[in-house]
Curated annotation (Swiss-Prot):
Protein name: Sorting nexin-16
Regions of compositional bias (Pro residues) in chain numbering: 1-10
Keywords, alphabetical: Coiled coil, Cytoplasm, Endosome, Lipid-binding, Lysosome, Membrane, Phosphoprotein, Protein transport, Transport
Annotated Low complexity bias: 27-40
């Protein structure tokens, strides 16, 4: 893990010019997601951390855009590709060709992708917002609830006739409860939808700074931010790889079971095919008894053939006369009795 970056407090009055001259210097850190954004009077201030940044309205009007001071972990996604890259388009291109930007013509609703509870130095929750400036260009900014509240206060001053409702604060219960955070995420998403529904509000300076429309995040905003984001990606990648290995093991087990079942089905089909090719109609009766399989086979054609042979042999045999047989037996018995009487 990278060593936490500790911001150094800077005086606002003496160092304002140095911050204004170098527009690429940003003083956000991984522990202070919510740095300040410009108010309607032109002064930036952040009450959450010690880092501060000061510009004035005249400089912002001269440069036709302002510095986005709040995003912590920021990256840019191109299209639907999962590869990550940062915005490298120069500001001059955007200033010289304002027609190429379609945010003014057709603003897209920023999407809150989720939230994360940070515990680097002070525990707080950040919400990840996906901003789409065009179908080919989008990026992610991280905002705290206080950033939304500060933006809402600015919009009330700039547009008194509009009232954009924010989810209420929670004073006495746990602010890190999962159900509470999910409900707050839905409320913040509704806030963003109502915000971009009005063209004047969606294109005002405060909203453009909040979403970094004029200054898309780059790769060199903060070294600590880049390190923290890379560590988050590494941890996510590790968990995804473990989940992938578990799924692969499950797939291999199912493939093995499927192969065994297929072999059993093939064996049954082979046996059925063999029985259908045997001559004659054979009747098989299988019954499991005492752990053994008893097989009884009877051939109807063989039985019929044996019956016909026995009938034909019976036609050629001499007929037997029961009367003659009875007289012969009587003669033998009489002779035997006479012989026995002579012996006596």
């Amino acid at each position: 893990m990278a060593t936490p970056y500790v911001p150094v407090p800077m005086p606002i009055g003496n160092s304002a010019s140095s911050f204004t001259n170098n527009r690429n210097q940003r003083s956000s850190s991984f522990g202070s997601v919510s740095t300040s954004s410009n108010s309607s009077k032109g002064q930036l201030e952040d009450s959450s951390v010690g880092t501060c940044k000061h510009t004035n309205v005249q400089d912002q009007m001269d440069s036709a855009s302002s510095v986005c001071g709040s995003p912590l972990i920021r990256t840019k996604f191109t299209g639907t590709d999962s590869s990550i890259e940062y915005s490298a388009r120069p500001r001059d291109t955007e200033e010289q060709h304002p027609d190429a930007l379609n945010w003014e013509d057709r603003p897209s609703t920023p999407t809150i992708l989720g939230y994360e509870v940070m515990e680097e130095r002070a525990k707080f929750t950040v919400y990840k917002i996906l901003v789409k400036k065009s179908p080919e260009e989008s990026w992610v900014v991280f905002r705290r609830y206080t950033d939304f509240s500060r933006l809402n206060d600015k919009l009330k001053e700039m547009f008194p006739g509009f009232r954009l409702a924010l989810p209420p604060k929670r004073w006495f219960k746990d602010n890190y409860n999962a159900d509470f955070l999910e409900d707050r995420q839905l409320g913040l998403q509704a806030f963003l939808q109502n915000l971009v529904a009005h063209k004047d509000i969606a294109n005002c300076l405060a909203v453009r700074e909040f979403l970094c429309l004029d200054d898309p995040p780059g790769p060199f905003d903060s070294l600590e931010e880049s390190r923290a984001f890379c560590e988050t990606l590494e941890e996510t990648n590790y968990h995804l790889q473990r989940e992938l290995l578990e799924k692969q093991k499950e797939v291999e087990s199912l493939k093995k079971l499927l192969g065994e079942k297929q072999l059993h089905i093939d064996a049954l089909e082979t046996r059925i095919r063999t029985l259908s090719l045997e001559p004659g109609a054979s009747l098989y009766v299988s019954r499991a008894e005492g752990g053994q399989i008893l097989r009884v086979q009877s051939s109807v054609l063989q039985v019929n053939r044996d019956v016909l042979d026995e009938e034909s042999r019976a036609d050629h045999k001499p007929h037997f006369n029961s009367r003659e047989a009875g007289s012969a037996i009587a003669d033998i018995e009489v002779a035997q009795l006479a012989y026995n009487a002579e012996d006596d």
